């Protein structure tokens, strides 16, 4: 098969591993920088051009779209979908997962456990907003932040009010969430492919830090999850419509709570922690499902 990997940087660990896994299984891998693509949108034969050439003959696409290029990256991916190319994750599912508020609303609708969350732009009663999520300590997040950036732990009512008012002064949309103290600065990353959790790791925040992101100095280790945690992770990915996802959850006194569903989960930390060939599993998923799509397409021609 000819498999395209939408990635801005071919030297990134995840991109390299996916290319290696493609080639190890006898497939052709092509790295495509979505920002350098341009599209011909028409009702007869939509196409994508890259470096002066038509991008044709692809059997599947693996989208590794950075948060900063979500709009354009999803536009390019949508064009591939219009050309009837199989995508590991569809553009609409990626868009859902990148909108933090929308993703939480979808999880809420499906009854998936998550921290109590408030959303505001210019609340006229900041103390009531804080009270709504259980009071201090609480977590305050910028809606557009990634990798732990724009996330603040406010330990007192006064600190919370000050941070919220500061963000309001920047005309930023914010979320406030209850702080899950019993999680102890740790979360669990569940790697979902299809309807299965195929790998898990525990991420522990560094000393003096409450954010467990590996980019923030957190550490990763093996962890065994419960059947309830497994079911919750799969349900969260399904709520977004994602076939491949990194689902982050917290262990709380009332069960697993979803923090985030990532449509382009990194491979480096979890492959190192679990010693599993996750890149290979993604390619295996493509082999099984792209073939099904192609068979269905032939039936309807």
Swiss-Prot record:
Gene3D superfamilies from the UniProt entry: 3.40.50.20, ATP-grasp fold, A domain (3.30.1490.20), ATP-grasp fold, B domain (3.30.470.20)
GO biological process: protein modification process; SOS response; translation
UniProt domain ATP-grasp: residue ranges: 104-287
Binding site for ATP: 141, 178-179, 187, 211-213
Domain of life from the UniProt record: Bacteria
Entry binding sites for Mg(2+) 2: 260, 262
Entry binding sites for Mn(2+) 1: 248, 260
Keyword Signal attached: no
E.C. code: 6.3.2.-
Cofactor notes: Binds 2 magnesium or manganese ions per subunit.
Annotated binding of Mn(2+) 2, by residue: 260, 262
Positions with a binding annotation for Mg(2+) 1: 248, 260
Keyword match ATP-binding: yes
GO cellular component term, pick one: cytoplasm
Gene Ontology molecular function, alphabetical: ATP binding; metal ion binding; ribosomal S6-glutamic acid ligase activity
Co-factor(s): Mg(2+); Mn(2+)
InterPro entries documented for this protein: ATP-grasp (IPR011761), ATP-grasp_RimK-type (IPR013651), ATP_grasp_subdomain_1 (IPR013815), RimK (IPR023533), Rimk_N (IPR041107), Rp_bS6_RimK/Lys_biosynth_LsyX (IPR004666)
Entry keyword set: ATP-binding, Ligase, Magnesium, Manganese, Metal-binding, Nucleotide-binding, Protein biosynthesis
Similarity comment: family membership: Belongs to the RimK family.
Entry protein name: Probable alpha-L-glutamate ligase
Species this protein is from: Photobacterium profundum (strain SS9)
């Amino acid at each position: 098969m000819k498999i395209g990997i939408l990635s801005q940087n071919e030297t990134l660990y995840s991109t390299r591993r996916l290319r290696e896994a493609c080639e190890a299984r006898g497939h052709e891998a092509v790295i495509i920088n979505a920002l350098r693509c341009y599209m011909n949108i028409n009702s007869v034969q939509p196409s994508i051009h890259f470096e002066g050439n038509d991008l044709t003959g692809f059997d599947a696409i693996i989208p590794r779209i950075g948060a900063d290029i979500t709009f354009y990256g999803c536009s390019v991916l949508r064009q591939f979908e219009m050309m009837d190319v199989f995508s590991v994750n569809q553009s609409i599912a990626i868009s859902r997962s990148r909108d933090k508020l929308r993703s939480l609303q979808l999880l809420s609708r499906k009854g998936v456990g998550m921290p109590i969350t408030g959303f505001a732009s210019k609340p006229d009663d900041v103390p009531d907003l804080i009270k709504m999520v259980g009071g201090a300590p609480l977590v305050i997040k910028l809606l557009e932040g990634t990798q732990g950036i724009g996330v603040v732990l406010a330990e007192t009512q006064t600190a919370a009010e000050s941070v919220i008012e500061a963000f309001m002064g920047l005309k930023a949309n914010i979320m406030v969430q209850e702080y899950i103290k019993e999680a102890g600065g740790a979360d669990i990353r569940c790697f979902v492919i299809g309807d299965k959790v195929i790998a898990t790791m525990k991420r522990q925040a560094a000393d003096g830090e409450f954010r467990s992101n590996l980019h923030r100095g957190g550490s990763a280790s093996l962890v065994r999850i419960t059947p309830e945690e497994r079911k919750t992770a799969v349900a969260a990915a399904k709520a977004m419509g994602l076939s491949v996802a990194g689902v982050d959850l917290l262990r709380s006194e009332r069960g697993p709570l979803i923090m985030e569903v990532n449509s382009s989960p990194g491979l480096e930390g979890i492959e190192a922690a679990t010693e599993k060939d996750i890149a290979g599993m993604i390619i295996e998923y493509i082999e099984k499902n792209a073939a099904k799509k192609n068979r269905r397409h032939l039936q309807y021609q």
